[in-house]
């Protein structure tokens, strides 16, 4: 899956993120991501006093579909109920739909954020990799065109990760455009991959035919010079990764608080009908 960060601050603001460009295509070519729908229960892991957060629960639903022939579609929903000190409970609902073409050159996105059922933000547009640049054309919240540095999109980012993990690479750095926040920046990522292993726990019961498969423990840190000038990541996520792209046992760390995501339901989609005539 791709990765999301969403922080509900006291002001009600939300921050959204979807978790070596030249080498990405070759590393990703042998990776096969399985279409699926995964549901995660969210709970508060820890909260520093300065965060103002006294409680957090929620649910994350992630749907991934498509193939290396037709491209990849994702539908994502991330709902959190956050209790703040001396403030009423706030419900934030992040809804995202994206399409990434099979070549990893085009990326379309629609991000909507609701706070207490009220639409407070919508970002809509598309991005293309052209002449070593990432050209972003926004239609909402207002029309705008941005020329950013060349990078990769979320599905290719995940394929690269799995390819490097299978090759035994434990540490690398790369970049990503994921249409986070205002869809106006490329973020840097630092990836650490642990030793592949079997980790039986409550979540493996949900994995069905993949329950005995081994996983890689992975940590990804995201950096953005526009927000952090001290070299510290703006967000960090830990998770267990299967070679087919499914993830579980998530810990999402925002600095002054973190939350856990436990996989509670997994549906694997039958794509046999969609692969007729597809040799990839």
UniProtKB/Swiss-Prot annotation:
This is Cell envelope integrity protein EipB. Disruption phenotype: Sensitive to the cell envelope stressors ampicillin, deoxycholate, and ethylenediaminetetraacetic acid (EDTA). Decreases virulence in a mouse model of infection. It comes from the Bacteria. It holds the Pfam family EipB_like. Its main location: periplasm. It is found in: Periplasm. Monomer. Changing residue 69 to S: Abolishes disulfide bond formation. One of its GO terms (cellular component) is periplasmic space. Residues 1-24 form the signal peptide. Functions in the periplasm to maintain cell envelope integrity. Disulfide bonds join 69-278. Keywords: Disulfide bond, Periplasm, Signal. GO terms for biological process: cell envelope organization.
